[in-house]
């Protein structure tokens, strides 16, 4: 697992914890902040996955052109 992917997973977990704590305590602001943090981290993870897929595809094309 790449460093970026690991960081995204940690941020997702942190966001989930904040969101859950906000729900539990009735703190709508904390709940919203947690949701946003979790969602942004998931987006970063998906972008990293897409980057990896493109890099792999480029490598395959390069090998076929040799």
Curated annotation (Swiss-Prot):
What's the protein name? Answer: UPF0337 protein SAG0606
Q: Where is this region: Disordered?
A: 1-23
Output the InterPro entries linked to this UniProt entry: CsbD (IPR008462), YjbJ_sf (IPR036629)
| UniProt similarity note | Belongs to the UPF0337 (CsbD) family.
Matching entries from Pfam families are given as: CsbD
Name the SUPFAM superfamilies for this protein.
Hypothetical protein YjbJ
**Residue spans with biased composition (Basic and acidic residues)?**
1-10
